[in-house]
């Protein structure tokens, strides 16, 4: 999905440079610290949401599955993972929890889900559900805005805010999105 390109490192680099005025050369230490933090939190998020993403991807491979049985929100289900960038992002749900949320969905065997997890893991940023990826980026930007508003800034250097809504994220961040070569030539 197009939203996945907004979670790429290149997009966050551009946001840090433009919106937060953190220069990768003159502010190298801060820039690298913030990028490393972003990558770490994104990896935590990926690991915490991987099982759900794998389960949902497996549903698409069940011939008898009807989309009416599982309707997903644009946001990751809070009952499965209610996370904050300020603290470790860790999954606390199981397949049984997912099945309880979606009782009309077909049962997927654990080994099938594990195979799908391995398949998705080749590039989590591009392979996981784009709506959840952009939600994570949005939450990370809110985290940066909060950091910028404090006197003891750790990941920003000025009182700068990058404001937009989650619903308007694709439009607001379009100038920063990573665009792969094959899409440029399309």
Model regions and ranges:
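Acidic, divalent-metal-binding catalytic cores of TOPRIM
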Residues: 1-186
């Amino acid at each position: 999905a197009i939203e996945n390109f907004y979670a790429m490192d290149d997009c966050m680099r551009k946001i840090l440079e433009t919106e937060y005025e953190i220069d990768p050369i003159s502010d190298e230490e801060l820039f690298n610290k913030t990028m490393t933090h972003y990558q770490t939190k994104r990896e935590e998020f990926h690991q915490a949401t991987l099982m759900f993403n794998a389960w949902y991807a497996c549903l698409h491979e069940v011939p008898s599955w009807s989309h009416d049985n599982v309707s997903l929100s644009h946001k990751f289900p809070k009952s499965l993972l209610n996370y904050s960038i300020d603290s470790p992002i860790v999954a606390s749900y199981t397949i049984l929890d997912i099945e309880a949320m979606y009782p009309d969905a077909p049962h997927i065997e654990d080994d099938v889900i594990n195979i799908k997890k391995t398949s998705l893991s080749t590039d989590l940023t591009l392979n996981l559900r784009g709506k959840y990826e952009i939600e994570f980026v949005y939450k990370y930007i809110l985290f940066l805005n909060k950091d910028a508003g404090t006197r003891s800034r750790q990941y920003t250097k000025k009182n700068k805010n990058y404001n937009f809504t989650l619903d308007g994220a694709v439009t607001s961040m379009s100038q920063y999105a990573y665009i792969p070569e094959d899409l440029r030539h399309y």
